[in-house]
Design a protein with these regions (language model features):
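Generic hydrophobic/packing signal
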Residues: 8-13, 57, 61, 100
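A structural motif
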Residues: 30, 35-39, 48-78
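Surface-exposed beta-strand edges and flanking loops
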Residues: 46-49, 131
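Detector for Asparagine
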Residues: 4, 15-18, 30, 39, ...
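Activation targets extended, charge/polar-rich intrinsically disordered C-terminal tails
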Residues: 67, 71-151
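Glycine-rich catalytic cores of cysteine/serine-nucleophile enzymes that process amide/ester linkages
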Residues: 1-47, 78-87
Length: 151
C-alpha cells in the first residue's frame, strides 16, 4: 500500500532473530526482518484497484494491526501448503494467506487458489512487475495503487 515500502504489513517473524515466534508484523526496508537480512532479493508487483478498494484494504489492515495481539502466525497452515493441504485456523495466517484474505475482504477480484502460495499472485489479472532486485536498492518511481512485495 506504500509505494516507498516504508510500511509493509504481513504475517511473519515477530523477532527477526527467531523464526518460530510469528504474528502480524509491520516492516520496512530498514526495519525488522529486512534490517537483519540486508541482502534480501525481492520482486515488487502492482495491480490497479479503485479508491474504494484501497480504502477498504487500509481499514482491514489497520483493524488487524489494532488487534494484532489476537492474531497468530499459521505455522500449521504453512506446513500444510507443502503437503498440498489447506489448514485454516481462526485468527491465524501465513503471509500469502493474509494477503489473499485482505484482498477478498476489500472486494478485490482475484483468481487465487484455496491453498495460496506467493507465486500464485503472479496470476492476478493486470499484475505488473515494478522492480526486481535487492530490496535495499529499491527506489520508488511512479507505482500504481497496490504493491504486493516479496513474492
Amino acid at each position: 500500500l506504500d509505494e516507498n515500502l516504508t510500511k509493509m504489513y504481513s504475517f511473519g517473524r515477530l523477532n527477526p532473530y527467531n523464526p518460530f515466534i510469528g504474528g502480524f508484523v509491520h516492516e520496512g526496508i530498514n526495519i525488522g526482518t529486512f534490517k537483519r537480512f540486508k541482502n534480501t532479493q525481492t520482486a515488487v508487483y502492482s495491480i490497479m484497484i479503485s479508491d474504494e478498494q484501497y480504502n477498504r484494504l487500509n481499514q482491514i489492515i489497520h483493524k488487524v494491526e489494532a488487534t494484532s495481539q489476537e492474531y497468530k502466525f499459521n505455522f500449521v497452515g504453512l506446513v500444510a501448503v507443502a503437503l498440498h493441504m489447506k489448514i485454516q485456523r481462526r485468527r491465524a495466517f501465513y503471509c500469502a494467506e493474509f494477503v489473499k484474505y485482505a484482498m477478498k475482504k476489500a472486494q478485490i477480484r482475484n483468481n487465487l487458489p484455496d491453498i495460496v502460495k506467493p507465486e500464485d499472485f503472479l496470476n492476478l489479472e493486470n499484475i505488473r512487475l515494478e522492480y526486481k532486485g535487492a530490496l535495499k536498492q529499491y527506489k520508488v518511481e511512479e507505482l500504481p495503487t497496490l504493491n504486493v512485495a516479496n513474492l
